[in-house]
Structure formats: C-alpha cells, structure tokens
C-alpha cells in the first residue's frame, strides 16, 4: 500500500510518500510545494492543488492522509490553512483516492507513542522509522508523519475488522 501524507499550509505544503509492505515502512519521496506569497490567494491554492495532483500522478498512491487543522488564535490564518487543506483534499478526491484526516495529536501518538511529543521527537522518529539519512525538511517530515500515522491506523483498522469477523463467527 502506498500512502501520500500531506501537511497543508498556505505558504508551504509538505508531502511525503511511503510504501507499506507487510510490517515494513519504506520511504518513497518527500518534499514541499512552495507558493509565491506575492500572488493572489486563489493562485496559491491552484499551485497547491496542481503540485499535489502531479505528485499523485507520479507516485499513484492508494490513499491520501491529510493533517487536520490545529486551533489558532488568528482567524485569518486558520481560514487560509483550511482552504489549503481543501485544495489538498480535492486533489485526492479528483484522483479517485480515499482521503483520511488525522489530528496532530493522533499523528504524534501514532509516530512517537505520545500525543504531546515535541516536533523534534516526531522528526527524529520519522528519520529512524523510514531509515532516512537525515531529518527531512520540517513540512516534509510532518507529511511523512501523517503518512506513517495512516499506515499504522490502517493496520489497526484491519485488525479490528478481522477481530469483528472472528467474534461474529464464534457467536
């Protein structure tokens, strides 16, 4: 299973592609889509959408995992982040992919085992889990963490479905 993780942002959108083969997580690619803050906001959203559509076309993931909005005191920033998330979600939906959303707490819990882990702990764990030569750029590392979260969540979901089936056949 190939997963595209996305850390949306109105200026920088991180992406990370991983492959899950059995119990192994394999790094495929990561990077960031940069938008030109001199351009109007709709053009920046288009840049995010087109950049992610190109990544989807290149790597053909089976699923897209997007980090959910964090709480923000700045309403304008929260709205722009929400719109960037929308562009990311639409890229996945138009490609016909299932899109999953995870909170920062869920991502940290899945990667480090602690929902209140520091960003540096998450980055270091991603480096170790994916056998990276160095810590990825911050936004890309966050996106890889979202992808790892989904990989771990899909394993748990599959286990729960199997347990549910076993429970029904034993009843």
Curated annotation (Swiss-Prot):
GO biological process, one term: DNA repair
Listed cofactors: Mg(2+)
Entry's Gene Ontology molecular function annotations: crossover junction DNA endonuclease activity; DNA binding; magnesium ion binding
Name listed for the protein in its UniProt record: Crossover junction endodeoxyribonuclease RuvC
Taxonomy, superkingdom: Bacteria
Cysteines paired by S-S bonds: none
Subunit structure: Homodimer which binds Holliday junction (HJ) DNA. The HJ becomes 2-fold symmetrical on binding to RuvC with unstacked arms; it has a different conformation from HJ DNA in complex with RuvA. In the full resolvosome a probable DNA-RuvA(4)-RuvB(12)-RuvC(2) complex forms which resolves the HJ.
List of residues binding Mg(2+) 2: 67
Catalysed reactions, semicolon-separated: Endonucleolytic cleavage at a junction such as a reciprocal single-stranded crossover between two homologous DNA duplexes (Holliday junction)
Enzyme active site: 7, 67, 139
InterPro entries per record: RNaseH-like_sf (IPR012337), RNaseH_sf (IPR036397), X-over_junc_endoDNase_Mg_BS (IPR020563), X-over_junc_endoDNase_RuvC (IPR002176)
Cofactor note: Binds 2 Mg(2+) ion per subunit.
Organism in which the protein naturally occurs: Geotalea uraniireducens (strain Rf4) (Geobacter uraniireducens)
Subcellular location: Cytoplasm
Family of this protein: Belongs to the RuvC family.
Residues binding Mg(2+) 1, per UniProt: 7, 139
Keywords carried by this UniProt record: Cytoplasm, DNA damage, DNA recombination, DNA repair, DNA-binding, Endonuclease, Hydrolase, Magnesium, Metal-binding, Nuclease
């Amino acid at each position: 299973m190939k997963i595209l993780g996305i850390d949306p942002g109105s200026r920088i959108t991180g992406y990370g592609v991983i492959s899950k083969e059995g119990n192994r997580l394999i790094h495929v690619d990561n990077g960031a889509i940069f938008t030109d803050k001199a351009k109007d906001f709709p053009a920046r959203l288009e840049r995010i959408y087109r950049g992610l559509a190109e990544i989807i076309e290149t790597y053909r993931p089976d699923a897209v995992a997007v980090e959910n909005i964090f709480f923000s005191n700045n309403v304008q920033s929260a709205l722009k982040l929400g719109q960037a998330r929308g562009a990311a979600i639409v890229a996945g939906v138009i490609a016909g992919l299932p899109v999953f959303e995870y909170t920062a707490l869920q991502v940290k819990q899945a990667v480090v085992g602690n929902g209140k882990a520091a960003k540096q702990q998450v980055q270091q764990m991603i480096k170790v889990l994916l056998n990276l030569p160095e810590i990825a750029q911050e936004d890309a590392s966050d996106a890889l963490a979202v992808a790892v979260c989904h990989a771990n969540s899909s394993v748990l979901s599959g286990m729960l479905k199997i347990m549910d089936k076993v429970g029904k056949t034993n009843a």
